[in-house]
């Protein structure tokens, strides 16, 4: 299926892994039962130009993915998970995140979202970062919350290195 998608002209795939959380499986179990299937799909997608790996959940085992064949890495930057800059430093790959995911996004105030987004933009300083939700954003959230994200994007100015 992955190869057929690329044959049809897609630039890449979004691939989510849901079995890499501390306490869910051991490293040995992951290597034996999960990684071979991940590699099969990511190898088929390797000729794509924009493959994103999303590591679902909390307490992720980030080290297990350092050499996965994906161009971009996405995960929830919640307590217990690596920060955007930590993951980028660990893997050298661009990261996707910085907007709270569901259900938190819909439960936050616009000011809290602005603060969170500003902090993530500042953390990465406009480098190796695509601003996106930690997971997804539920449909039907208050438009003011989406506008809070937009305001921070327009207000952001990277510092000179």
Model-based region annotation:
Residues 1-161:
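Active-site loop segments of alpha/beta catalytic cores
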